[in-house]
Amino acid sequence: MEQSKELDGGTLKLIAAALMLIDHVGAILLPETVILRCIGRLAFPIFAFFIAEGYAHTRSFGRYLLRMAIWAAVSEIPFNLEFGHFFVPGRQNVLWTFCLALLTLRGLDRLRRVPGNIGYAGAALALAAGFAAGELLHVDYGGWGVMTVALFYLCREGRYARCGLLLGMLVLNGLCISSRTVPAFGIAVPIQILAAAALPVIWLYNGRPGVNRRWRWAFYAFYPAHLLVLEGIQALT
């Protein structure tokens, strides 16, 4: 990804966390306030971008995946409580989406090393398997969430990477990922298409982490913690 000198990783993650908080305030406390959900559409692409970047730069894929899986398990009950139950088999939190995305990227990298058409077929198979797993396991954003991370990974470099990323985001979020709609220009427009508006923010990333490695635990912990706080407020009102 081309560097600029605007936002480091810590700042960009704080922006994503704030956007996620706004989104979940809308989802849990103020479901009729559509503008909050519109603003929140920008959060997932930023986190998906960092999963792709994290995979590309991690020194230990196993530890990265294990860390993600542990926090996914910790976050499952707080996520389920949004739907009023401790166990909701038809919905899994977004950290499981990212676990599947990491496995998909691993398979993609391994299989596309094979020379010739077999390598291309293997890469396509890895993507198809990741998509199918996302759909079958009912993770947040489904298979298209897994594909979003893959899109960021595949469009990290290259002359036309940003054009491909923009086109891919418009297709994924405008046509593939389901969301509520709002009337605009006489038609029903899915609010999910606003996720593409996260790209200019992401393109300000300067490639520097910006925070101590120990702070990464705070970003993981924020996800289940803020859900519990919002659900507690909902229970008291």
List each language-model region with its residue ranges:
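Alpha-helical transmembrane segments and their immediate juxtamembrane cytosolic regions
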Residues: 1-237
